[in-house]
Regions:
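Single conserved hydrophobic/aromatic residue that forms the stacking wall/gate
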Residues: 1-7, 11-14
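Short, charged amphipathic alpha-helical "coupling" segments at sensory-output junctions
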Residues: 18-50, 171
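Sensory modules in modular signal-transduction proteins
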Residues: 36-69, 74
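PAS and related sensory helical modules
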Residues: 79-95
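Terminal output helix/cap of sensory domains in signal transduction proteins
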Residues: 96-127
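A short, hydrophobic, proline-anchored segment that marks a local hinge/packing element in signaling
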Residues: 134-139
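Sensory-domain boundary capping and coupling elements
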Residues: 149-152
Length: 172
């Protein structure tokens, strides 16, 4: 077995027969799949519906802010740490924070945009819960800044974990 290129796609070729073992996906097939609602990623495919369900199932809140500092997306998990409404879509992220913290928001965004930093994290007490908030610079393959992703998670119960749990203990 050897690696080969078909067009710009990688495939595996049987060294005895020379026939491809894995069919390379042609560009036209990728376009057709996208038109049918299938999203093509470097590591696989899924539908928009599947992706949205995955993002909403994650045990974290996700908010994405684009390179122009506008809120573009938030996950709508059932138990969000911080409530969001669709009214924030398109709004400058600075307008979504208390005035006294806007200078911190700008410092994080500026550091991400210039490439000085890629992560900022905080943890805060909200009532009796410990909330972990992380900001990540989102970059393309060439390192170009695309925006910022905020990930918030209630870690109160996670902090209580001790030892190991190796077996399923569901009560039927």
């Amino acid at each position: 077995i050897s690696a080969c290129l078909v067009g710009s796609e990688m495939c595996i070729r049987d060294s005895l027969t020379g026939t491809p073992k894995i069919k390379a996906v042609k560009e036209e097939e990728k376009v057709a799949a996208t038109k049918e609602g299938v999203l093509q990623f470097e590591t696989g495919t899924m539908t928009k519906e599947e992706l949205e369900a995955i993002l909403d199932t994650l045990p974290v809140d996700i908010t994405f802010v684009d390179k122009e500092d506008s809120v573009k997306y938030f996950s709508k998990a059932e138990k969000r740490v911080f409530v969001r409404t669709k009214a924030i879509i398109g709004r400058k992220v600075q307008l979504c924070h208390p005035q006294k913290s806007v200078h911190i928001v700008n410092r994080i965004l500026d550091s991400f945009k210039t490439g000085k930093k890629d992560v900022a994290e905080f943890w805060i007490q909200v009532k009796d819960r410990l909330i972990h908030i992380r900001y990540f610079a989102v970059r393309d393959k060439n390192g170009k800044y695309l925006g910022t992703m905020e990930v918030s998670q209630d870690i109160t119960d996670i902090k209580k974990i001790e030892g190991e749990k190796r077996l399923l203990d569901w009560k039927d």
